[in-house]
From Swiss-Prot:
Pathway the protein takes part in: Protein modification; protein glycosylation
Transmembrane feature ranges: 10-30, 44-64
Primary gene name: dpm-3
Domain of life assignment: Eukaryota
UniProt-recorded name of the protein: Probable dolichol-phosphate mannosyltransferase subunit 3
Organism for this UniProt entry: Caenorhabditis elegans
């Protein structure tokens, strides 16, 4: 199974390669585009980073908004904290 790093790297390398070929006019894509779209090709990496950041922010906000309250996990965690405190008191590390 391919790791996520390899998958993302392949997409990024492909995007950069296509953009670089279009930007340096090795592949004459800009001659077929209207003049108003040339700036989109020139600033495509900036737009890609910008949209990736926007996606990341909305993904985090969505994750926080739909986060479930885990009552069982809270009780379990409080029990583990109590056990740790009792053990530290037995070892006389805390009072």
């Amino acid at each position: 199974m391919v790791s996520q790093l390899v998958t993302y790297s392949a997409h990024v390398i492909l995007f950069v390669l296509v953009w670089l070929l279009a930007y340096t006019d090795v592949v004459p894509v800009l001659s077929y585009l209207p003049e108003c779209l040339h700036c989109l090709v020139n600033y495509a990496p900036f737009f890609a980073v910008l949209f990736l950041g926007i996606y990341a922010v909305f993904n985090v906000v969505y994750g926080v908004a739909t986060f479930n309250d885990c009552a069982e996990a809270k009780v379990e965690l409080l029990g583990e904290i109590k056990e740790a405190r009792e053990e530290l008191k037995r070892k006389r590390i805390i009072d």
